[in-house]
Structures are given as structure tokens and as C-alpha cells.
Amino acid sequence: VGDEAQSKRGILTLKYPIEHGIITNWDDMEKIWYHTFYNELRIAPEESPTMLTEAPLNPKANREKMTQIMFEAFNLPATYVTIQAVLSLYASGRTTGLVCDSGDGVSHMVPVYEGFALPHAILRLDLAGRDLTNYLMKIMTERGYSFTTTAEREIVRDIKEKLCYIALDFENEMNVSAASSSIDKSYELPDGQVITIGNERFRCPEALFQPSFLGMESVGVHETVHSSIMRCDIDIRKDLFANIVVSGGTTMYPGIADRLQKEITALAPATIKIKIIAPPERKYSVWIGGSILASLSTFQTMWITKEEYDESGPGIVHRKCF
């Protein structure tokens, strides 16, 4: 589990219990939580209230099962389930804005007004980090490098995280890279072999803006952000356009803020001010927002306690966690 599995990946097959933000393998997930409580945090779960986060528009059963495991397997005194994007906004010191959160399994656009997510305008895009890693594996194969095993996928993920960037103008960048080798970078594989990566550096994350690269029919993140804002009340759109906060690991590419600014400016009315906020710590802003929320004195009445769970069962999570 965790880093130990990574360090032995050469002889193991790596599996992920979460797909597109939804837990698909509960036994494995329980092992990860066990590892987190006992080996990483080194705390006694039965003494530690724990906040969990999830993607918006997740199946209700997912929440209930999560709550059930926390109370029945780990005997927590209290728990709370909250939506990731809202926490990212808190971490940026805002209560109103549109959050574009993109992690490993799912991306979502969540408009928040005065601290409340607007459920009718939340849009979800099942295109995120893992899809980009798979796509990079595919286009690296076209270059003649073979990456197929789960261990090799982790190498490609590392290449993606270290070398990929988002082009401001994709066509222009393609022309530049065809004419010169200025964007070529080399990467040393664990076995010492050095490989070269060229236009794959920006072709890979370009799929966020052009999902057709992955054979998907959905529109890109910029259009999804715009659609989400347009689903909101006309009076608050101006505030949302001026507070677009990006968060999650898949927003860490250099160039993402400038590109979003350019694309959304092209979609929005000319008079509207558009501001993209991309805090440097955005990979962890959900966690930061969670620690802010959990430490507020006003939040202490919000926890679902073990007593409440024993009385009402897992369904209580829908009543107490908005």
C-alpha cells in the first residue's frame, strides 16, 4: 500500500481502488485508510474525528458506504463528508467563485456563492490526470518507446508531472516544435536509459482543452467552465468570472492559467473581467480548505457523531452533510 507498493512496483501490479472519483473497490480502499491512519498519520482512529472529501455528483451509495466503514471498521468518534471544490475555494480565502478542480480521476466545475455550492450548475468532466497519463503512454508509443505495465505507467506519470506544459497557442506551438528542437527535453528512466520527449510535452495536456484527442465527445475544460457559469443566475455571473479558482494536481501544468484566461475571454462577453486564480499550493488546496473548515468553532456542531450514526444509520450523511 502507498509508497511501499510504489517502491516494489517492479515485481507488483499496481491497482487503484478509485476510478473517476468513485470508489470501486471497497476492500482495497479500507486497506488504504487503515494504512493512512496507522502507518502515515500514526493516530488512533477511535479518538480522531475525520473529515472525508468527495467529488460532486458522486453516487449517494458511495457516501453511505464511506460513512459506514468509518464508523464500523474504524470506530471513529465523528466524521463529516464534504465536496472537494468548496474546500479549495475556502483555501483561497473566498466564499464566492467558480472552482475548476481536476485531480486524478475526475474534473469538476463548481460555482459557489457565499459558501454554498450551486448544485444545478455543477458540471463534471470524466477527464483528468489518469486519462492524460494514458494518453501520454499512447503518444510516447508512437515515438517508439514502449510503456505497458502498471510500473511503467508510473514512470510516464512522472514524465508528465515533470515535463509537460500547456501551450498558449497549440497550432503555433506545433509549428515551432516542427521547425526546431528548442522544446525537446531528455528524461532518464530508472534503468539509466535516456529518452527524448518533444511536442508530446504540450500535446498531452492539450487534451484538457480538446478531449477529442482522447476520442471523447465532450467539450474542453474552458467550455465546461463557461457553461457552468452560464447556468448560474445572471446577477452573480460577473463575480464568478472574476473569481475562477483552479485546484488539484492536474492544474499544476505551467501555462494553464494563461491558457484558461485566453480561452474563457474568447467565450465570455467582451466587457466582462476574467480572473484566473492559480495558487502555488493548489495541489493541496482541498486539504488546506478541509483543515480550515474543521478547525472553525462554528463547524463543531456539524460533525456526525457515532451516537447519531448508531441511531440513524448511514443515511444520516445526506441529512447532515450538504
Swiss-Prot record:
Its EC number is 3.6.4.-. GO terms for cellular component: cytoplasm; cytoskeleton. SUPFAM superfamilies: Actin-like ATPase domain (SSF53067). It catalyses: ATP + H2O = ADP + phosphate + H(+). Keywords: ATP-binding, Cytoplasm, Cytoskeleton, Hydrolase, Nucleotide-binding. InterPro entries: Actin (IPR004000), Actin/actin-like_CS (IPR020902), Actin_CS (IPR004001), ATPase_NBD (IPR043129). Gene3D superfamilies: 3.30.420.40, Actin, Chain A, domain 4. It holds the Pfam family Actin. It is found in: Cytoplasm, Cytoskeleton. One of its GO terms (molecular function) is ATP binding. Its main location: cytoplasm. The keyword Endoplasmic reticulum does not apply. Belongs to the actin family. Actins are highly conserved proteins that are involved in various types of cell motility and are ubiquitously expressed in all eukaryotic cells. This is Actin.
